[in-house]
């Protein structure tokens, strides 16, 4: 209790500042001992988070699905966690480890305050919005070091705008749509059935990308589908049908049925 009390009041530094005889207690003579002030491992505390965070919150024996950090943590947090958990639990504290590269400036240089090339995420959100930053993160191949700067973010903003315009178009084209208007897939024209087949392929690719933690594949597949298969192809072919065919036209109803499936 005396040791616990000392560390509760003084933190880890209590070992260096405390009266060591008081820590030993009256049953031991300090002259028989030599206090050691060497650092065991700077990552020792963080390596024990599996016991004091995960198990404390979710129960003994529970381990993390994923540990996520930069490549430098193979000799840091990943390693200390593995060693401590293997020694005390007989197993790794995680099911998988995901390592990402580092964010560099637009010229591929390491960011440094002294150089003045640090890109502040808060400024990006203030200038462009959080969704632009999220899309940039999702679009980057984190297996390598990634660059970020005004030109890179401009490209991300363009991709975001195209995605948003795709959804805005569908939202407008679906005005007044109801279940009574729906057409069975078997009764749809070949073009609509083709787009639904492409949607099925997209679903398989997106799920595969997420399972593999390759989120850049997810973002690329989604944007390519929206830009090429929908905007430049499907929407362009069917725009006359949407605006010129009668409301009861089966082709128009089939088109809007597919739009409803795509949107939702």
What role is predicted for each listed range?
Residues 182-183:
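Generic long, charged, amphipathic alpha-helical segments
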Residues 187-194:
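The feature captures the catalytic groove of carbohydrate-active enzymes
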């Amino acid at each position: 209790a005396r040791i616990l009390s000392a560390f509760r009041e003084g933190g880890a530094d209590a070992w260096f500042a405390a009266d060591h005889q008081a820590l030993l207690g009256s049953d031991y003579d300090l002259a028989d001992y030599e206090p050691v002030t060497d650092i065991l491992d700077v990552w020792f505390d963080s390596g024990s988070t599996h016991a004091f965070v995960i198990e404390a919150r979710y129960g003994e024996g529970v381990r993390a699905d994923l540990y996520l950090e930069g490549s430098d943590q193979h000799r840091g947090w990943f390693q200390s966690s593995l060693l401590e958990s293997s020694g005390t639990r007989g197993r790794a504290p995680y099911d998988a480890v995901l390592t990402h590269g580092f964010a560099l400036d637009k010229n591929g240089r390491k960011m440094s305050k002294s150089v003045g090339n640090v890109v502040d995420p808060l400024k990006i959100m203030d200038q462009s919005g959080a969704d632009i930053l999220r899309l940039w993160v999702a679009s980057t191949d984190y297996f390598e070091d990634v660059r970020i700067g005004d030109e890179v973010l401009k490209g991300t903003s363009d991709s975001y705008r195209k995605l948003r315009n795709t959804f805005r178009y569908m939202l407008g084209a679906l005005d007044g749509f109801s279940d009574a208007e729906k057409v069975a897939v078997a009764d749809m024209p070949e073009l609509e059935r083709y787009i639904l087949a492409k949607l099925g392929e997209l679903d398989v690719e997106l799920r595969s990308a997420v399972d593999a933690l390759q989120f850049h594949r997810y973002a690329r597949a989604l944007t390519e589908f929206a830009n090429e298969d929908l905007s430049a192809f499907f929407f362009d072919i069917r725009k006359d049908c949407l605006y010129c065919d009668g409301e009861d036209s089966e082709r128009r109803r089939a088109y809007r049925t597919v739009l409803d499936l795509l949107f939702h």
